[in-house]
Amino acid sequence: MTTQSPVYRIELELAREPGHPEGDRDHSYRLYLPLTDDGHIDASRYREIPDWCRVLRNRPGEEQAHGRILRGPGGRWLFDYSDASTSDDEVGFRLSEERFEPGEYVSIREDDGKTHAFRIVSVRPD
């Protein structure tokens, strides 16, 4: 009997960078993704449940953005906030290679074209 990987709730916060020496808890993401036992994105499970894979983005001074997590060309992972446009899409760099566990870091190119590092603060089954 095989068990299917559950969807996990992954919390990210802006890591330290110029202008944010302590990072920024208010600049954050919440990802909902299936993970393997070793903490990598389970791409085969994703293909079975793409509608469950969501993203919430919080930035100071903005409304919370709700979107979908999509698998793009070349295996890239994209955050899509509007079906009508690709100008709001964001790219997670090498997310397929990342291990999602607290204390690790991931990079996201946001809709303004700037890339930021985000610290993984929690990972738990949803």
Please place each PLM-identified region on the residue numbering.
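Short beta-strand/loop turn elements enriched in aromatics
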Residues: 50-91
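Broad, structure-driven detector of short, well-ordered beta-strand segments within folded domains
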Residues: 29-33, 66-71, 118
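Short amphipathic beta-strand and strand-loop transition segments with alternating hydrophobic
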Residues: 1, 68-69, 123
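Exposed regions on extracellular, virion, or secretory-pathway luminal proteins
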Residues: 38-42, 46, 53-60, 95-102, ...
